[in-house]
Regions:
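Positively charged n-region of N-terminal signal peptides that target proteins for export
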Residues: 1-4
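Acidic, surface-exposed loops and disordered segments
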Residues: 8-13, 18-191
Length: 191
């Protein structure tokens, strides 16, 4: 989890540093990324098929090692299956399970990284569409072989990450972004 967070921080910093001051579109993207966070207060409400397709397309556009696109996404709307994967999921919420191959010429860390890039694209796209999002690793322990089979996951794949998408309630002090460590305590420069 810590490695994932460090990797995402590096990617975010790289995106921010590549923005020219005069580019309003880029400045808007940086502002959007800086304001995004993992939601905690979801509510009931349908997420349209069109939104899910946009979100999946954004994930599919992510970069990957050797352009291998080490991902398979399983969209779960079935309430019973969602309940077996995680608790307290509101009616209408959708889970996207990111899976990667068990066997590859690339190390499993690369496959997980590729999945994380795709999930981050989907995370941000869902938020741009006005939806709440949250990534999970802990519920992966619930995804045993039987459940993966019922999710129609490819046989040679394992679950890497879960993205929850849904309608959200108003942001409050509990549901807002968690405090960040000061950036200067997480970055060093070598001139």
């Amino acid at each position: 989890m810590k490695k994932f967070m460090v990797i995402m921080l590096v990617i975010s910093c790289a995106l921010i540093s590549s923005v020219s001051a005069g580019d309003e579109r880029a400045a808007g993207i940086v502002e959007f990324i800086s304001g995004s966070f993992s939601h905690r207060n979801f509510t009931t409400g349908h997420v349209s098929d069109e939104m899910i397709q946009q979100i999946l397309a954004a994930g599919h556009k992510a970069g990957s090692a050797g352009n291998q696109q080490h991902w398979h996404f399983t969209v779960v709307r079935n309430k019973e299956l969602i309940g077996e994967i995680m608790e307290n999921v509101d009616e209408g919420n959708v889970l996207i399970v990111g899976l990667g191959p068990n066997e590859s010429r690339f190390p499993q860390e690369i496959i997980a990284f590729d999945n994380a890039l795709a999930m981050q694209n989907m995370f941000l796209t869902a938020q741009a569409l006005g939806l709440g999002t949250r990534m999970y690793l802990r519920p992966l322990s619930n995804l045993n072989q039987d459940l993966l089979h019922r999710l129609e996951a490819p046989e040679d794949h394992r679950a890497i990450m879960i993205l929850r998408i849904g309608q959200i309630t108003a942001v409050d002090a509990v549901s807002q972004a968690s405090p960040r460590h000061p950036l200067e305590t997480r970055v060093n420069f070598i001139e």
